[in-house]
């Protein structure tokens, strides 16, 4: 049977008062990504042709944060309940397409669970996602007859037998566009809150003799929402543990899964080791036998085989060749490219520069807008002076160059192959091949020197 086209509605208009934040609730992040972005991505994975994003509070902020998302922005000017929210998108529904209703503050719903829900949807009926809770207090109970859902009874309206039911409503549901439009038009607001509830569709479907089936989520965390920062932290830790468990099963040695954060994607080789408190952001690729020390932050980097990144190093938008050694306390800024067998040591910062094979930059050095050849030694305290207050300039260093400690290279400047620069030198002109350059003043010895005495 040919599958129906699919569109998604994501409810994301809530303010999130209990977050105590100026940021709309659904923009708070899980694993480095706004909660609603997780839901949008899942809808895309499902193959949704249209994603209708219902927004309200903080609309300008929402549009700014999600400017690149392929969604249909649907404004809910007043928040009058879940059915009212979906009503705002109903004019965009096609009669013969399936519509799945999702929630922007429930970010962990999976493609696999939603596929089961969509497959279970009866013709002209509703498929409802439910979950079994050990403590269902406060949730709407699922009432079944002959396996079908005939009602959702709220806590305050439930009798003693109904209160013992563990199966509860999640709010996630699927029906076709024509049915949604028909039932949404009939939803009333005759309740204490004066709001329009999506749960009323269950009773309306049963009135029309349309089947309502329930599919149970196997993991309660899939449907958990975050209304406050405590719940947000619980979702974060759950997802991080899930991601760490997957990596462990793939052969990555994560020394403490509870102290590992993946806020993007990680592609890895064999025998990778990751110590505690490491943060992975953006898209990171690690080769075979890479070792990441404690407290490192890696963002959008490619790391070759047999590289060791020692503790508390920060790498961003950089490339590191095989058998290199980085850190501890190194910083690679965007545009840093290190060839194979390079060494970058403690308190070294490299930005928008290339370092050739086998070269060493081991201590207390800044390299910016530079090209360093192979087999060079850059001493402690070397500075490439790349900025004149208005523009950046390049420093180009050839192969087999030795740069002594406390040297300043005032760009634009070139140092040819084999040159040696003495410690304490300031380079302002190009250096020729195999030259020795020293600019420091001659050392003087003054006998009988008397240091100044403090005045009392």
From Swiss-Prot:
Residues 251-456 are annotated as: N-acetyltransferase. Its EC number is 2.7.7.23, 2.3.1.157. GO terms for molecular function: glucosamine-1-phosphate N-acetyltransferase activity; magnesium ion binding; UDP-N-acetylglucosamine diphosphorylase activity. Residues 230-250 are annotated as: Linker. GO terms for cellular component: cytoplasm; membrane. It is an enzyme of class 2 (transferase). The keyword Coiled coil does not apply. Pathway: Nucleotide-sugar biosynthesis; UDP-N-acetyl-alpha-D-glucosamine biosynthesis; N-acetyl-alpha-D-glucosamine 1-phosphate from alpha-D-glucosamine 6-phosphate (route II): step 2/2; Nucleotide-sugar biosynthesis; UDP-N-acetyl-alpha-D-glucosamine biosynthesis; UDP-N-acetyl-alpha-D-glucosamine from N-acetyl-alpha-D-glucosamine 1-phosphate: step 1/1; Bacterial outer membrane biogenesis; LPS lipid A biosynthesis. Mg(2+) binds at residues 105, 227. Its cofactor is Mg(2+). Homotrimer. This is Bifunctional protein GlmU. It comes from Haemophilus influenzae (strain PittEE). The lineage of its organism: Bacteria, Pseudomonadati, Pseudomonadota, Gammaproteobacteria, Pasteurellales.
């Amino acid at each position: 049977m040919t599958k129906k086209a699919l569109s998604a509605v994501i409810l994301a208009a809530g303010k999130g008062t209990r977050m105590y934040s100026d940021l709309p609730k659904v923009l708070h992040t899980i694993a480095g990504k706004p909660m609603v972005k997780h839901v949008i991505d899942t809808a895309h994975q499902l193959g949704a042709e249209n994603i209708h994003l219902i927004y309200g509070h903080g609309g300008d902020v929402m549009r700014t944060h999600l400017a690149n998302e392929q969604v249909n922005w649907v404004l809910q000017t007043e928040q009058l309940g879940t059915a009212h929210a979906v009503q705002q998108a109903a004019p965009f529904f096609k009669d013969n397409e399936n519509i799945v209703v999702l929630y922007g503050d429930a970010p962990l719903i999976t493609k696999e669970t939603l596929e089961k829900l969509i497959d279970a949807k009866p013709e002209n009926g509703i498929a409802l996602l439910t979950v079994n809770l050990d403590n269902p207090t406060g949730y709407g109970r699922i009432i079944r007859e002959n396996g079908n859902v005939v009602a959702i009874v709220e806590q305050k309206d439930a009798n003693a037998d109904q209160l013992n039911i563990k199966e509860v409503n999640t709010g996630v549901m699927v029906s076709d566009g024509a049915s949604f439009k028909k039932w949404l038009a009939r939803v009333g607001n005759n309740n204490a809150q004066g709001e329009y509830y999506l749960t009323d569709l269950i009773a309306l479907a049963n009135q029309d003799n349309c089947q309502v089936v329930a599919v149970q989520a196997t993991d309660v965390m899939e449907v958990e929402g975050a209304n406050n920062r405590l719940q947000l932290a619980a979702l974060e830790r759950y997802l991080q543990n899930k991601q760490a468990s997957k990596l462990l099963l793939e052969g990555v040695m994560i020394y403490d899964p509870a102290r590992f954060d993946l806020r993007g994607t990680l592609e890895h080789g064999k025998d990778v080791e990751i110590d505690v408190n490491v943060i992975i952001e953006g898209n990171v690729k690690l080769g075979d036998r890479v070792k990441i020390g404690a407290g490192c932050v890696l963002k959008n980097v490619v790391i070759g085989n047999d590289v060791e990144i020692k503790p508390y190093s920060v790498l961003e938008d950089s490339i590191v060749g095989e058998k290199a050694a980085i850190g501890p306390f190194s910083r690679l800024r965007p545009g840093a490219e290190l060839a194979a067998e390079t060494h970058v040591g403690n308190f070294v910062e490299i930005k928008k520069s290339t370092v050739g094979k086998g070269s060493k930059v081991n201590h207390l050095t800044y390299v910016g807008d530079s090209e360093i050849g192979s087999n060079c030694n850059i001493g402690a305290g070397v500075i490439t002076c790349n900025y004149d207050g208005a523009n950046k300039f390049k420093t180009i260093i050839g192969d087999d160059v030795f740069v002594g400690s406390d040297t300043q290279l005032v760009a634009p400047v070139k140092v040819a192959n084999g040159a040696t620069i003495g410690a304490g030198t300031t380079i302002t002109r190009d250096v020729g091949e195999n030259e020795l350059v020293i600019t420091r003043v001659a050392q003087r010895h003054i006998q009988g020197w008397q240091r100044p005495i403090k005045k009392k």
